[in-house]
């Protein structure tokens, strides 16, 4: 070896086999070290969000230096110069520095990398949870779709049996069931009867006692209840399982407001009755009931209950409609019969009206002719009384016979000025013969403030007073009858039993108050509500005091037309009776000054009854058994 060469000899010979392997290994190590930084550079370029770029730069420098060290080491397997040794030393020193710095930086980076791993796991868990939630959402959507479909099918009809059949078929198709059945309560309510199935129709009619523990368990829960496949409720099909028995669930179906639910003599069901729906999965399938399937069954059971209640309401409506049609037909027939009866009655009344008016006109004509002759004062008074009675009888005949006019409310008042005091005088002249026959005293008292003239219907007013006073005389055997007339005070216009009567006091009008008091048989509290009814007779009236029973009823109608009020008061049987009525009359603007105002005075029953030359007259009561009262003239 040349002494002038500053070279370093290797530790092994160049042709040594180990040296060759090391040479080759260093070459490939250097090649790998130089390729790794290129891959890191490509990764950093593609990853725009990588947070540790400077760390990768340090790794790249470390790897490049390591590769350079191995590459320089290739020249050390042969004789090499000292320059190569210096370069190798510098490369190793730089590699040591960079590797130490990188190692120190990893102390701070590794915890962050661990956190990244934890976050990755957390995100995976969240992703799994989201997947589960999405599965639940998809399941709910599927359940909702099936429920919507089933609801549409159920509500497409309001026939109960169609609803139940459709429900079972659609549930069996949607849930892929081996069998689905419905148990309904029997007529006695002590058992459940199988009414509907999908496949095994031969089992329909089977009966299960309602007091079984499994039935009570289903009734006491509004959720799906799992029942054994050996339960009597599950005996809806033959057991064909060879390995795994089928899972069976049951749920109650409220029968809401069902009546007359007839199938195989089913009873009338109340709102607390329940049916039981049983659902069976296919056997040997190892399939279990999932939560969304249970939820679907619960929702469908509620929808079936609502649909059944709607169907029941429709059936009740149809039955009510049919009943109403039958009643309308019956009412129409009754209306036609009533119209025929009314026509016949009107014809009869028209004939009777004509036949009664003929003799009445003769009486009026003869009485008018008698007034034109020379009569005494007493005779003239009697003939005038006959004329007034005939006129009043004509009015009564018009009212009683023209029933249709009274019933349809077409009766109208004849408003005209009249002498109010003379009206009471005429009433006394009409009732005093009957009172004299029964030896009753009649007292008439007119208040000083009572006007002489008034405006109203004199005939109706006179008829009211005659009906009330005549009624008092009729039911009084002994004693007296008093008639008092005055102007009513506004606070006294409402009777004790008429809270809805509201009189209206206005200028130009006044209310006439008339009180008729007797000492007769009185009225019992039981008969008081019936006194103003047509053809009503008190039980204590007796057979001699029975009239037509129209007087008070007509009087009440006339008082109502005159915007008044009428009522009776009695302390009981045998204690007399007091009749009070108010009528609204007009006040004349210019009363006749030539007429003298009548002062209140008592009238005796025999006043004007006739003197020794009185004309023979007769006053007839409505009862034909009452004897006639005659006043004979002297011969």
Swiss-Prot record:
Domain GAF per the UniProt entry, residue ranges: 159-308
UniProt keyword terms in alphabetical order: ATP-binding, Copper, Disulfide bond, Endoplasmic reticulum, Ethylene signaling pathway, Kinase, Membrane, Metal-binding, Nucleotide-binding, Phosphoprotein, Receptor, Transferase, Transmembrane, Transmembrane helix, Two-component regulatory system
Cofactor(s) it depends on: Cu cation
Residues bearing the modification Phosphohistidine: 354
Membrane topology: Multi-pass membrane protein
Listed GO MF terms: ATP binding; ethylene binding; ethylene receptor activity; metal ion binding; phosphorelay sensor kinase activity
Membrane found in the keyword field: yes
Localization in the cell: Endoplasmic reticulum membrane
EC number: 2.7.13.3
Domain of life: Eukaryota
Coiled-coil segments: none
Similarity field: Belongs to the ethylene receptor family.
Name by which UniProt lists this protein: Probable ethylene response sensor 2
Species the sequence originates in: Oryza sativa subsp. japonica (Rice)
This protein's encoding gene: ERS2
